[in-house]
Amino acid sequence: MTTIKQVALEAGVSKSTVSRFIAQNGYVSDEAREKIERAIKKLNFRPNLSAQSLKTKKNQLVGLLLPDISNPFFPMLAKGAEEFLKEKGYRVMLGNIGEKNQSEQDYLKVLIQSNAAGIISTHDFKEDFPDLDIPTVIVDRVGHKSNYGVFSDNESGGRLAAKVIVTAGAKKVAVVSGPLNATNINNRFKSSIAYLKEKQVDFKAFYSQSYDFEEIQKEAREVLANEENFDSIIAPSDIHAMAYIHEIHRLNKKIPEDIQIIGYDDIQMSQFIYPALSTIHQSAYQMGLEAAQLIYKIATDQAIEKSKIELPVHYVARETIRQKRKE
């Protein structure tokens, strides 16, 4: 009896591509379709439709794979996704994948074996796992190649952060970027720099490779010991901004009089530190909710109006930005 594996070998495609063709579930290119049809005819293959139906029936499980749940932004994102999915009768498996590829692979294996209905993740792993046929929605770090995604308007956010400090009289700015392999961070960083150049404001770029508070503190110490006499800082996240505030206090400098600083995310604790952090707000909860709604529509074969959803951002004025001087 001819198997799917034999058809795949004959057609020169993967087993999962043959499975999608037979189940009529998921994308198969015209070229692959023709090869499979020829192979099926040549090998006289007859699929077991009842077994295929059982195999392709999806479990009501959604994987939620996030990079660092110690960062308050991501638990709020998870809350938005989980509340919607639970209401729809779905279970959520939360995976703290960090930046380790092995952890991601381990979670993916479990989700594949469980025949999960979908995945919500900050990392688009289609390039690493091209045969993965579980519907996936990317959140926060959405690239051009992502099929489905929910993200904030990072370009506007980066520009807005720069505009706020320039309007408040910035003369020399430290622009801090998070890890540049993250699309969202990269877009913000470029937009902030473009605005500073446009307004001819002096700046220097610094690169942070961590979201760990203690590591960021070390980086902040080096930046502020730079003897550049920065009067303003654009931080890539509220966590970064808080680490810089801690270091500015240690140096006995006043915020915002000596150094003003703007964060990004508007996590809950940003309003409780001293001084309260001025920041760019993006809704982590709404991002998770929109991603969950999108994965639910995909899993239940509903019409999808937009495959990529961009959420607005806005400035939240608190105490770390100088008041605009009156003329």
Curated annotation (Swiss-Prot):
Domain HTH lacI-type: 1-56
Keywords: DNA-binding, Repressor, Transcription, Transcription regulation
SUPFAM superfamilies: lambda repressor-like DNA-binding domains (SSF47413), Periplasmic binding protein-like I (SSF53822)
Classification via InterPro entries: HTH_LacI (IPR000843), LacI/GalR-like_sensor (IPR046335), Lambda_DNA-bd_dom_sf (IPR010982), Peripla_BP_I (IPR028082)
Pfam families found in the cross-reference section: LacI (PF00356), Peripla_BP_3 (PF13377)
Portion annotated as DNA-binding: 4-23
This protein's name: Ribose operon repressor
Gene3D superfamilies: 3.40.50.2300, lambda repressor-like DNA-binding domains
CDD domains: HTH_LacI, PBP1_Qymf-like
Protein function: Transcriptional repressor for the ribose rbsDACBK operon.
GO molecular function, a single term: DNA-binding transcription factor activity
